[in-house]
Regions:
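Short acidic, S/G/P-rich loop/turn micro-motifs used as interaction or catalytic elements
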Residues: 1-2, 43-47, 74-75, 92
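Conserved phosphotransfer cores of two-component systems
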Residues: 31-33, 57-64
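Short, well-ordered alpha-helix to beta-strand connector turns
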Residues: 14, 35, 81-83
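Output/docking surface of receiver
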Residues: 71-106
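Conserved phosphotransfer microenvironments
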Residues: 39-60
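Acidic, metal-coordinating helix/loop segments flanking the phosphotransfer/catalytic sites
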Residues: 19-37, 45
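Two-component/phosphorelay signaling modules centered on CheY-like receiver
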Residues: 1-18
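Short beta-strand elements of ligand-binding domains
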Residues: 41, 66-72
């Protein structure tokens, strides 16, 4: 339920967003066009292995691709694949600021 809301918040903030729940569809989308940033929503500790696999696949294909996990603080300390972490926020401005910070520093 939060993913569509986050997508819309990013769109309203001026970002172009492509979104999917499917790892295979995500890889197809990634192969079809370049992205400034790929956000992988990690839902709890149980989602880490799938998120890390997707991150690894993306980095294998294009090492320079920016990848960030959207997750809570606990998940953030359990993984090291992504370039950065955007903390799960109920504050839309903080979420957008996290995305902007990643893009600005790269």
């Amino acid at each position: 339920m939060l993913r569509p809301l986050r997508d819309q918040i990013l769109r309203i903030s001026g970002y172009t967003v492509d979104s999917t729940l499917s790892v295979s569809e995500a890889m197809s989308m990634f192969a079809a066009k370049p992205y400034d940033l790929i956000l992988i929503d990690v839902e709890g500790e149980h989602g880490i292995p799938e998120a890390e696999q997707l991150c690894s696949s993306v980095k294998t294909e294009r090492n320079e691709q920016l990848v960030a996990f959207v997750c809570n603080w606990r998940v953030a300390i359990l993984t090291d694949c992504p370039d950065d972490i955007v903390r799960t926020e109920f504050d839309p401005a903080a979420f957008v600021a996290g995305v902007k910070k990643i893009l600005d520093k790269n």
